[in-house]
Amino acid sequence: MLTRRAALLSPLAFAAARTVSFAQGGMTLAMHQNTSSGAGYRGSLEGWARAGIRHVELNAGLVDQFLETDTMAAARRVLTDNGLTPVSGSVGVGGLWEPNPDHAAALETLRRRCEMFAELGLEKVYGSTGANGTFSETDYDAAVDNVRQAGEVASEFDLQMMVEFIRNSAFISTLTTTLRLTRSAGNVQPMLDFSHLLTGLSQLGDLDLIRPGEIAHVHFQDVPDLPRELLTGQTRAIPGTGIAPLTHVLRTLRDKGYAGPLSVELFLYQDDDPYELAREIRESAEAVMMEAGVLR
């Protein structure tokens, strides 16, 4: 019997066309659509492809905007016509992880986003942990069920659900808390964002807690030479232009068995020309990856 995902993709055999394996080791450069969101869905992808980018991370909001005036088939063609492989997607759904009265509605929104991303040939999606409020220790026990339910929704579409911890989240802001929850849930994997790891409450030593093959996806940025109190999403730097210990983290991830995309997610350059920006990012980031010995 066909799964829901297979049924969605079979008309164009899209899953086969878009499947990518990183089993042979090494890491590849990818671009997150948040980095060039001002250019829209088509503009960002076409510009990056001209610059030699082959792996991309999709933003649900940009896909939604594209579908307001075009079709899902057209959205797929933007990927295939430009030789692009979508390696992950941001579902853009709040309230998935922390206990809150709108959790059931959040799961329904997640279900719609998973269906959309499955049609685009993705295998992984993630939700961020941005949350406000005051929480207690018992809330983390309840959160295990929330994490598990999100993983179950994603699995309906043969998607792997991932958690991205956010440095200033009031609920899940560290790698250690993320590992605790994903391990307890059992069906959701942690992902790692360099900026959130290196500028928040996490420590470099926390990387030693990662089990082999546990990290499912990585966002790649540098940190500028600023007082830590001034670091924000807007200060994220192109890999290779800051002071972060990028090669150390990359080598640690390699030793922990990570062999996947490094997706550059920045917010300062969203209105820049996607082609020129991707050229600059590729030159700088791939030099760092080569120095670390992880570039495939």
Where are the regions that the model predicts?
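Acidic (Asp/Glu)-rich catalytic clusters
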Residues: 45-50, 67-88, 111-121, 148-156, ...
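Histidine-acidic metal/acid-base catalytic patches
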Residues: 2, 7-12, 22-29, 38-51, ...
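Glycine-rich, proline-tolerant flexible connector loops at the mouths of alpha/beta enzymes
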Residues: 58-76, 132-135
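N-terminal substrate-binding region of glycoside hydrolase catalytic domains
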Residues: 51-67, 90-94
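Active-site-proximal loop/turn and secondary-structure-junction residues that shape catalytic pockets
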Residues: 35-37, 60-62, 92-95, 131-133, ...
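Short, contiguous strand/loop micro-motifs
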Residues: 31-32, 61-63, 99-101, 136-138, ...
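Active-site acidic/histidine proton-transfer and metal-coordination neighborhood
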Residues: 12, 16-17, 41-46, 81, ...
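Hydrophobic faces of well-ordered beta-strands that scaffold small-molecule active sites
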Residues: 27-33, 56-58, 86-91, 125-127, ...
